[in-house]
């Protein structure tokens, strides 16, 4: 989701004067709902994408204060690993974040630029037209655990893209 939304925000910034309709389908019931991990976040990409992210209250509130890497021998004993052995593990200037919170914040930024975001709608099938991807069909709703249609059943919706369809998984 972070990659999806970041790419869309970048596209909108580059094409500010062009009328575009952009839609993001998120399989989770809420943005960031499938992002369970924390992260040590390096801000270079965010600095380029949204230079005023600090003023916009991006959820980067905990700066890294210290790096410590230890080799765990058992539940009581560990050996510190000297920092010169792990030069890429220097995190000065980075932030400890919740990726789910960053996803939600990026979604807010995208929506403020006119992106329509629809959580709870996984893309289940690809629609092809003349040999090219033309859109997607969302997953059916209202089926029981065995796949049988309940009274609340609704078939998936067809969503067509005028220009392009981007598929992304992970971040």
Ranges and model annotations:
Residues 2-6, 20-27, 127-129, 134, ...:
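Hydrophobic, aliphatic-enriched repeat segments that assemble into extended interaction scaffolds
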Residues 3, 7-11, 108, 112:
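Short, well-ordered alpha-helices that flank and scaffold nucleotide-derived cofactor binding pockets
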Residues 8, 12, 18-76:
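N-terminal FAD cofactor-binding segment of flavoenzymes
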Residues 17-18, 158:
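Residue-level detector of alpha-helix boundary/anchor positions
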Residues 57-171:
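Feature captures the FAD/FMN-dependent oxidoreductase FAD-binding
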């Amino acid at each position: 989701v972070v990659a999806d939304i970041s790419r869309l925000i970048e596209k909108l910034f580059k094409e500010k004067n062009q009328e575009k309709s952009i839609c993001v389908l998120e399989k989770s019931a809420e943005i960031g709902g499938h992002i369970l991990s924390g992260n040590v976040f390096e801000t270079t990409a965010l600095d380029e994408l949204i230079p005023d992210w600090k003023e916009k209250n991006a959820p980067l509130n905990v700066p890294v204060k210290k790096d410590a890497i230890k080799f765990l021998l058992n539940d009581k004993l560990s050996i510190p690993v000297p920092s010169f052995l792990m030069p890429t593990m220097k995190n000065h200037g980075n932030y400890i974040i919740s990726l789910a919170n960053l996803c939600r914040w990026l979604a807010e930024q995208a929506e403020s630029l006119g992106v329509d975001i629809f959580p709870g709608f996984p893309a289940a099938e690809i629609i092809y037209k003349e040999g090219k991807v033309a859109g997607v069909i969302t997953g059916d709703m209202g089926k029981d655990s065995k796949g049988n249609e309940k009274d609340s059943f609704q078939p998936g919706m067809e969503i067509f893209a005028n220009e392009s369809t981007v598929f992304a998984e992970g971040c």
